[in-house]
Amino acid sequence: DSSTQMGPLANQRRIAAMEALIADSKARGGNVIVGGSRCSEKGHFFSPSVVTNVSDDATLMTCEPFGPVAPVVTFDDLDEVLARANKLSYGLSSYVFTESAKTAHSVSTRLEAGMVNINHF
């Protein structure tokens, strides 16, 4: 279907992994504000999901989900952001969105990630 903007996950194990991330986040006080479940029993489609109030010890904060589940967290300063981002085991890719070239350079050089994207996906 040419109008598809998001395809299925690879298999049932990936669906189960997304469900586990959601369950773990909720058990640790997270709030699912959109999505949070598979789209239907047919195929391997999981709803794009956003979780707020995610604790730092939740699996969602310490892994790269490889699926449509994202945490949204608040922070007090850039040092806190960098500490959280650099806590990941893998850090394959990161994204910096800012209007300041100085901030983009400062943050991107301090991120421990394979790829740092600035102001784009």
Positions of predicted regions on the chain:
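Flexible, acidic loop-helix segments that line cofactor/substrate-binding pockets
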Residues: D1-A20, S37-F45, T62-G67
